[in-house]
Amino acid sequence: MELSYPEKLTLIKLAELKRAKVEELVKESGLEQVAVMRALLGLQAKGLAKLHERSERVVKLTETGMKYAQIGLPEWRALKVLREKGKATLDDLKDVLSEDELKPIVGLLRREGWANVRKEDGKLVLEITEKGREASERPIDKALKLLAERGEVPVKEIEKLVPVNELKRRKIGEEDVITERVAEITEKGEELVKKGLELKKEVSVLTPELIKSGKWREVEFRKFDIKAPVRRIYPGKKQPYRAFLDKIRRRLIEMGFIEMTVDSLIETQFWNFDALFQPQNHPAREWTDTYQLKYPKVGSLPDEELVARVKAAHEHGGDTGSRGWGYVWSPERAMLLMPRAHGTALDARQLAKGVEIPGKYFTIQRVFRPDVLDRTHLIEFNQIDGFVVGEDLNFRHLLGILKRFAVEIAGAKKVKFLPDYYPFTEPSVQMSAYHPELGWVEFGGAGIFREEMTKALGIDVPVIAWGIGIDRLAMFKLGIDDIRYLFSYDLRWLREARLVW
């Protein structure tokens, strides 16, 4: 059996003592306490010794308590003055009491029955009583004396004299927990010592001096168990979800996508709905599905020509051949302000601003929707929106991009597409992926932007687009089953969450 030098020395000393406190072994062996503890743990793991621990609540003096142990409690110092003078004002007591001690002293002396209090010439006067003249040592005084003598006293012992809470209230004492460790040799350990242990100091560090002098040939090097468990180290790293978003962004840029810039979380309904060809009487625009700003309530519309084209698309389809929605479009409704409900509003802004054809664009943005918080829903979450614009794009291109997102980026094993409806896309599709804990989880929607939308924004070629809940993508990639964990303060998860890619 391989034993290190500290283990051998500790075991030999323990064999002599049979049972000993760690402090005794430190004294007998001449080793540091850390070395003795490490040796005992090693001996215990090898079945050569047992280590017993016993924790006990104790009371010890605070700084205030130490001061009182030297100069006396405030009431005794005040009583000394009263015994000499018979009576005294608060000013008379300032020579022996601090300002903090002076405030409660009147009530304390009165409660003990050591002084009567009255007013003379507008000043409080304390006059000693017979009980005050005869006052002698109380339980609290004995407790103070005991703590001063022994340093630490078990709570049970102090409680026989005075409640610990009373010492805490007066800031005389405080509680602590001490752990006593006692080592005991086993039969196996005794047998090994009887057989004889060669004490030869080991070297744990190969120094330049050992090499130069050649003494490295003579010394015994300490053996290290490379399989022994060690303390885990948690180096600093990015928040897991933040790191995931950064890698998604980098992957899309590598694929040739251009990131759309965003100035604000607040949109007018014009960009959030109207520019997307979503009618003003659509239920998704009501308070049950979106938030509205109380103040300020309205913003401004973009240039008149763009507004006129959007208005025409809503009322009669504009020059697309569509009949539109067939109602009178209200610019006042379009000016209402709201927190962005979906990232598609940014698609509309970018298309109106101008795009490269062919071109690929994306954005990762925070959006807001009223919802019931649960494992798969948040009221404030991130969404990845994007679109591809080009001459010959079709629905199959869109499905290919969506599947690539789910499989390559989220790591989903199974993906399915279902027909869906959105006012601004036709055809439209919903994408879901299978989560081992949650089952089928909806990722988001996609489709080909309708001409009523794209032509009003100045685009005459097909645009395929999608809006995906990237928080749910992250659930797959990070292996979690509760979306709220993405924003958790749980240190265990933050430390142990796996790194993606």
Swiss-Prot record:
One of its GO terms (cellular component) is cytoplasm. Mg(2+) binds at residue 426. It catalyses: tRNA(Phe) + L-phenylalanine + ATP = L-phenylalanyl-tRNA(Phe) + AMP + diphosphate + H(+). Its cofactor is Mg(2+). InterPro entries: aa-tRNA-synth_II (IPR006195), aa-tRNA-synth_II/BPL/LPL (IPR045864), Phe-tRNA-synth_IIc_asu (IPR004529), Phe_tRNA_ligase_alpha_bac/arc (IPR022917), Phenylalanyl-tRNA_Synthase (IPR002319), WH_DNA-bd_sf (IPR036390). It is found in: Cytoplasm. Disulfide bonds: none annotated. Its EC number is 6.1.1.20. HAMAP family: Phe_tRNA_synth_alpha2 (MF_00282). Belongs to the class-II aminoacyl-tRNA synthetase family. Phe-tRNA synthetase alpha subunit type 2 subfamily. Tetramer of two alpha and two beta subunits. NCBIfam families: pheS, PRK04172.1. This is Phenylalanine--tRNA ligase alpha subunit. It comes from Thermococcus kodakarensis (strain ATCC BAA-918 / JCM 12380 / KOD1) (Pyrococcus kodakaraensis (strain KOD1)). The gene is pheS.
